[in-house]
């Protein structure tokens, strides 16, 4: 199974002790996900992040409703966490979120290893562009959210 890699970095003008807690709240993912995906966290509150935590979502990809379940496999506040898809739209989705203090703010890095259903052809036709578009939206929202905070 061929894996594909996606990486993104974003510097936020806020300290890590303010940025990481935002990511610690699973429901904030709804705010960071483009509206066209109709993303919804299904796991009841409160969601306490820890290794082994399972989180269920509902999402629409190209109009097709999909349930997605991830597991938090690494939880190391305030430095990093890793979520891995157990069921959902991918054969593999392994997402490492890293937070580093830099230049008076926080460098947020996303490293994703993934393998879409349909393999390289689907990645080339749809998936890569979708992932890039989703992360661009996410970065724009994060800049809006953390630029407003005082």
Q: PLM features: what roles do these ranges have?
A:
Residues 12-14, 61-63, 89, 114-116:
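Beta-strand elements of well-folded, non-transmembrane domains
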Residues 133-141:
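A non-catalytic, amphipathic alpha-helix used as a structural packing/dimerization or gating element
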């Amino acid at each position: 199974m061929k894996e594909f890699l996606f990486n993104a970095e974003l510097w936020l003008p806020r300290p890590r002790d303010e940025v990481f807690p935002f990511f610690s709240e699973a429901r904030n993912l709804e705010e960071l996900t483009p509206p066209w995906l109709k993303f919804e966290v299904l796991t009841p509150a409160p969601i306490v992040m820890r290794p082994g935590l399972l989180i269920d979502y509902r999402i629409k990809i190209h109009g097709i409703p999909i349930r997605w379940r991830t597991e938090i496999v690494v939880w190391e506040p305030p430095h990093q966490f890793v979520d891995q898809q157990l069921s959902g739209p991918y054969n593999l989705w392994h997402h490492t979120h890293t937070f580093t203090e830099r230049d008076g703010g926080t460098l947020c890095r996303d490293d994703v290893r993934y393998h879409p259903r349909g393999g390289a052809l689907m990645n080339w036709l749809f998936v890569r562009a979708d992932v890039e578009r989703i992360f661009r939206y996410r970065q724009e929202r994060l800049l809006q959210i953390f630029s407003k905070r005082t």
